[in-house]
Design a protein with these regions (language model features):
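NAD(P)+-binding Rossmann beta1-loop-alpha1 motif at the extreme N-terminus of oxidoreductases
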Residues: 1-55, 63
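Short beta->alpha hinge that forms the Motif I/post-I loop of the SAM-binding pocket
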Residues: 38, 68, 92-94
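Rossmann-like NAD(P)-binding element
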Residues: 57-88
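Rossmann-like NAD(P)(H) cofactor-binding subdomain of soluble oxidoreductases
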Residues: 76-125
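Internal alpha-helical scaffold of NAD(P)-dependent oxidoreductase catalytic cores
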Residues: 130-219
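Interdomain hinge/lid region at the active-site interface
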Residues: 199-270
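A conserved regulatory-domain signal marking ACT and ACT-like small-molecule sensing domains
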Residues: 272-362
Length: 362
C-alpha cells in the first residue's frame, strides 16, 4: 500500500504519544501538524519541541489522532467527529470496545493502538523514532470507509510502524492476555511477597532475579492502569479465569506428585518462549546471551555499548539489573551470531569484565 503524506494532521492530546506522533509525522513529510490539549502548558511544550506547527482548537484535517487517556477517549472521539466534517479520525487507546461503541458506526472512525510506549511521560520525552518497527493495531468495523482505512494504514506505515488489522473485540481479548493479565499478576505476586513474613524474614529483602523479572511491570502508573483494567474488564476477567484454571492444574499435579505433568508443563512453556522470541527477533535461533558483571560506576554502560559498537557488534537488546552499590549488577546483552558473541565476550574479558555466554534457547 503506497505511503501518501498528509497535508494536515490534527492531534488531540499532546502528551508522550501525541507529541511523538507529531515528531514522526513531520519527519514523514506531513505538510502541517496542529494540536490541542486540555493542559495549555502541555500543548505549548509540544510546540516548543517541534512536534506541532501550531496549537489550535480547529483540528479539522486529513487525519485527526485522539491521544488522550483511555477513560477520556469515548467522549473526545465523539467530540472530534462532531466538530469535524472531512477528517478521518483515529485513536491510540490500548482498549477498543468503549471507543468503537462511542463512534456509533461513523464511517470516518478507525480505531488504532500503537503497541509501544515508555515509562516516561509528557511531550518533553517525545521521540519521533518511538514507532519504528512497532506493531500498530487498526480496528476497522463493518461501517469503516475503505478509503479512510487506507489513509490511516498509509500514515501508520509512514511512521515506521507495522499496521495490523484486527476485530475490536479480538483486540481486547488479545491485549488482556498479553499485556493486562501480566500487569495484574505482577502486582499480585509482588503484593503477596510484600504482605508475607516467613519466620521473621521479609521475602522482598531476599528477592532474587526470578521475582524481579516476574514483577518488572508491577506498580505501573495507577492513573493509567486503573482505567485500562476497568475499560477491558470483561476480557481481563476471562483471561484471569483461564489463568486460574491453569494454576489449579499445577496445584493438582503438586498434590499428586505428578512429575510427568510438571515436566511437560515446563517444556511447553520453554517452547512457547522460544516461539515468542522468534517472533520478536527473526534470528532468535542464533541469539546469544552475554551476562556481564559490572560495577556500580558512572559510564560503565556507555563504555561497554560503545566498545561493542566500535567493533560493529550489534546489540539486539539489553537489560541492566542492579544489585547494590557494593556488588554492582549484571548487564545482560543479546547478540546475534555465535561469532559475534564470542568476539564480544573476548573484548569485554580483555577489559576486565567477567562474562558468561549462552544461547538464548538453552
Amino acid at each position: 500500500m503506497a505511503v501518501v503524506p498528509l497535508r494536515r494532521l490534527g492531534i488531540v492530546g499532546t502528551g508522550l504519544i501525541g507529541a511523538s506522533i507529531g515528531l514522526a509525522a513531520k519527519r514523514a513529510g506531513v505538510g502541517e501538524v496542529v494540536g490541542v490539549d486540555a493542559d495549555e502548558g502541555t500543548a505549548q511544550l509540544a510546540l516548543d519541541r517541534g512536534a506541532l506547527d501550531a496549537v489550535t482548537d480547529d483540528v479539522e484535517a486529513d487525519l485527526v489522532v485522539v491521544a488522550v487517556p483511555v477513560a477520556q477517549l469515548p467522549a473526545r472521539v465523539r467530540d472530534v467527529l462532531e466538530q469535524t466534517r472531512e477528517a478521518t479520525v483515529t485513536d491510540v487507546g490500548s482498549t477498543k470496545g468503549a471507543v468503537v461503541a462511542a463512534a456509533a458506526g461513523d464511517t470516518r472512525f478507525v480505531g488504532g493502538h500503537p503497541v509501544c510506549g515508555s515509562e516516561a511521560r509528557g511531550p518533553a520525552n517525545a521521540n519521533g523514532e518511538l514507532f519504528q518497527g512497532a506493531t500498530w493495531f487498526l480496528t476497522p468495523t463493518a461501517h469503516t470507509d475503505a478509503e479512510r482505512y487506507r489513509t490511516l494504514h498509509s500514515f501508520v506505515s509512514s511512521l515506521g510502524a507495522q499496521p495490523i488489522a484486527i476485530d475490536p473485540r479480538a483486540h481486547d481479548r488479545l491485549v488482556a492476555m498479553t499485556s493486562h493479565l501480566p500487569h495484574v499478576l505482577a502486582n499480585v505476586v509482588l503484593n503477596q511477597a510484600g504482605a508475607t513474613r516467613i519466620e521473621g524474614h521479609d521475602p522482598l529483602a531476599a528477592a532474587g532475579g526470578s521475582l524481579r523479572d516476574a514483577t518488572r511491570v508491577a506498580g505501573a502508573n495507577p492513573r493509567i492502569w486503573v482505567d485500562i483494567f476497568l475499560d477491558n474488564a470483561e476480557a481481563l476477567q476471562a483471561a484471569l479465569g483461564e489463568h486460574r484454571r491453569r494454576v489449579e492444574q499445577v496445584e493438582e499435579a503438586l498434590a499428586a506428585g505428578d512429575a510427568g505433568f510438571l515436566a511437560r508443563w515446563i517444556a511447553e512453556a520453554s517452547e512457547n518462549r522460544r516461539s515468542m522470541l522468534a517472533d520478536a527477533y527473526p534470528d532468535a535461533t542464533d541469539l546469544h546471551r552475554l551476562r556481564v558483571h559490572v560495577p556500580d560506576r558512572p559510564g560503565v554502560l556507555a563504555g561497554i555499548t560503545q566498545a561493542l559498537g566500535a567493533e560493529r557488534i550489534n546489540i539486539e537488546d539489553f537489560e541492566l539489573r542492579h544489585v547494590s552499590a557494593e556488588r554492582g549488577g549484571t548487564l545482560t546483552v543479546l547478540v546475534a551470531g555465535a561469532d559475534h558473541a564470542a568476539r564480544a565476550a573476548a573484548l569485554l574479558e580483555a577489559q576486565g569484565y567477567g562474562v558468561v555466554v549462552s544461547a538464548v534457547d538453552e
